[in-house]
């Protein structure tokens, strides 16, 4: 058996095993989901399979467009070296700020990425234990890292750990999609979204993914 290293994530399945069950549940419980789910065929949520890279991409993408985020990410990954889908925390930690800024990162995002790398290199995140921890415990651990708030932690739960029942109420796209699909475009409060999401449990991550897809047919990835 190979030895684990600090920050090394356990293998994550590429797609959730619960997906088909979740789709059946949602179609039974929600008339909008019953119409939405068949529109997207066999496409489903997929994990990149690397914890550090997923979190780093979330930081890079904060407050900029998807297109701009991809451009900055590609330049940043090239500066780090290695595969852009599996960046090594140690290489990021050793990167000079000037090179990071040259990739298009703000000074603040450079600080965040270096702090993230430091947590992984120093073993201050308990990656090997995440599989046995509940969602809120993981969120608490992640938000201790600079630049990671609750929204970023929830995206990580959905896109990396493939947790089935996350409802990211701070996500603008989710609220916009609920407004479009359920309230004829009228503004939706977090409380209304939470109440609607009760019917989706225990598969609120899956419902959220389909709501996102209703706004943008391209699969969402982090």
What is each residue range found by the language model?
Residues 13, 64-146, 201:
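Alpha-helical ds-nucleic-acid-binding substructure associated with the helix-hairpin-helix region
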Residues 54-59, 75, 95-99, 137-141, ...:
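A general alpha-helix detector
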Residues 30-53, 57-58, 65-83:
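A positional/architectural concept
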Residues 1-43, 111, 131, 135-136, ...:
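C-terminal accessory module of base-excision DNA glycosylases/AP lyases that mediates lesion recognition
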Residues 28, 47-48, 84, 88, ...:
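A generic short alpha-helical patch detector that favors 3-5-residue windows
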Residues 58, 102, 127, 142, ...:
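Generic anion/oxyanion-binding catalytic loop in active/binding sites
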Residues 23, 33, 42, 49-52, ...:
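Generic secondary-structure boundary/loop-capping signal
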Residues 60, 149:
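Conserved S/T- and glycine-rich ATP-binding loop of Class I adenylate-forming
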């Amino acid at each position: 058996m190979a030895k684990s290293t600090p920050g090394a994530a356990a293998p994550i399945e590429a797609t959730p095993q619960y997906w088909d069950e979740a789709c059946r549940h949602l179609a039974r419980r929600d008339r909008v989901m019953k119409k939405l789910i068949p529109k997207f065929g066999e496409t489903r949520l997929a994990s990149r399979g690397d914890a550090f890279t997923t979190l780093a991409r979330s930081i890079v993408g904060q407050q900029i467009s998807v297109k701009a985020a991809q451009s900055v990410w590609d330049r940043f990954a090239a500066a780090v070296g290695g595969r852009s889908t599996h960046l090594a925390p140690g290489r990021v930690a050793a990167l000079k700020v000037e090179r990071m800024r040259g990739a298009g990162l703000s000074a603040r995002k450079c600080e965040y990425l270096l702090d993230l790398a430091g947590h992984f290199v120093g073993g201050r995140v308990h990656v090997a234990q995440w599989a046995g921890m509940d969602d809120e415990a993981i969120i608490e651990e992640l938000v201790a890292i600079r630049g990671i708030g609750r929204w970023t932690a929830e995206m990580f739960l959905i896109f990396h750990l493939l947790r089935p029942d996350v409802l990211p109420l701070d996500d603008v796209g989710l609220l916009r999609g609920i407004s479009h699909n359920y309230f004829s475009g009228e503004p939706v409060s977090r409380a209304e979204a939470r109440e609607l999401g009760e019917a989706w449990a225990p598969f609120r991550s899956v419902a959220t993914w389909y709501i996102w897809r209703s706004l943008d047919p391209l699969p969402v990835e982090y």
